[in-house]
A protein has these predicted regions:
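C-terminal outer-membrane beta-barrel translocator/porin domains of Gram-negative envelope proteins
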Residues: 1-130
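Transmembrane beta-strand segments that form the barrel wall of outer-membrane beta-barrel proteins
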Residues: 1, 92-96, 137-145, 173-183
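Residue-level signature of outer-membrane beta-barrel architecture
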Residues: 15-17, 111-113, 167-169, 179-181, ...
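Transmembrane beta-strands of outer-membrane beta-barrel proteins
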Residues: 11, 25-31, 107, 135-139, ...
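Solvent-exposed loop/turn segments connecting transmembrane beta-strands
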Residues: 1-5, 97-106, 151-158, 179-191
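Repeated loop/turn-to-beta-strand initiation elements of outer-membrane beta-barrel proteins
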Residues: 20-25, 116-119, 167-176, 198-200
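Outer-membrane beta-barrel "beta-signal"
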Residues: 165-167, 186-200
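Outer-membrane beta-barrel transmembrane domain signature
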Residues: 114-120, 124, 128-132, 136-161
Length: 200
C-alpha cells in the first residue's frame, strides 16, 4: 500500500483559575507530534498525476493546484500529520483543519464570565429543547504553529481572538456561539461543548 502509517501523540495541559464569584480564567497548552512508522508514496511525479496534473493540458492554474495538492500529500506521506489547527476548538478565526503538519503547538487563554444562574428556564429553539441552567460570555486569545520539522515549530505563528456566548443546559450540554478574528479575517462558529474538547 502507498498509504502512510503514523501515530499521533498529543499532550494537553489546562489550568483553571476561579475569579469573581462564579467565573473562570482558563489557560490551555497543546503539543502534538506525528511519529511515522511507514512512509507513503514519496515520488512527487506519481503524486502530481494522482492529483490530476496529467489532465491539465498546460493550464497553469490547474497545474499549480495539482502540484500544491501533491506537495501536501507528500508532506503527509513523509512526516505524518498531527493535531490540526483551525475550526471551533483551536484557532477559531480559521476554517476547520486550516493548518496541519507533523508537529503542532497551540496555546490559549479564555475568560469565562458566568453572568446568570437563574436556572430552569425552558428553551425551545429549532432542534434544541432543554432547560437553561447558566448563561456565559467568553473572551479568548489563542496562538498556534504547525511545521514539518520540530526545529521550525514556532517560527510561523497564527493568532486568533474573539468572544462568545454560551449556555449550559439542564441535560449537561453546553451550546456555544463564538466570533473570532485573526490573520485571515473573521469567522463565526456554532458548536456544542467547550473548546479544546477532543471529538471522535
Amino acid at each position: 500500500s502507498s498509504e502512510p502509517s503514523f501515530d499521533v501523540v498529543t499532550n494537553d495541559l489546562q489550568i483553571y483559575i476561579p475569579v469573581l464569584e462564579k467565573s473562570t480564567i482558563v489557560f490551555d497548552l497543546q503539543i502534538s507530534d506525528a511519529y511515522v512508522t511507514k512512509k507513503g508514496e514519496t515520488n512527487i511525479e506519481v503524486l502530481k498525476n494522482k492529483n490530476g496534473y496529467n489532465l491539465c493540458y498546460s493550464n497553469s492554474a490547474c497545474e499549480a493546484n495539482a502540484e500544491n495538492l501533491a506537495n501536501t500529500e507528500l508532506a503527509v506521506n513523509s512526516n505524518g500529520t498531527s493535531l490540526p489547527l483551525g475550526g471551533g476548538d483551536r484557532l477559531r478565526s480559521f476554517p476547520e483543519g486550516r493548518f496541519q503538519g507533523a508537529h503542532t503547538i497551540y496555546y490559549a487563554a479564555e475568560f469565562r464570565w458566568n453572568y446568570s444562574s437563574s436556572g430552569g428556564e425552558q428553551l425551545d429553539l429549532f432542534f434544541i429543547q432543554d432547560l437553561v441552567e447558566e448563561l456565559q460570555v467568553a473572551f479568548f486569545f489563542e496562538q498556534g504553529s504547525v511545521s514539518e520539522t520540530k526545529s521550525e515549530l514556532g517560527k510561523t505563528v497564527k493568532t486568533s481572538f474573539g468572544s462568545g456566548f454560551r449556555f449550559l443546559s439542564g441535560s449537561g450540554n453546553l451550546y456555544r456561539a463564538d466570533f473570532a478574528t485573526g490573520n485571515e479575517g473573521p469567522n463565526f462558529s456554532v458548536i456544542i461543548q467547550y473548546p479544546w474538547t477532543y471529538r471522535l
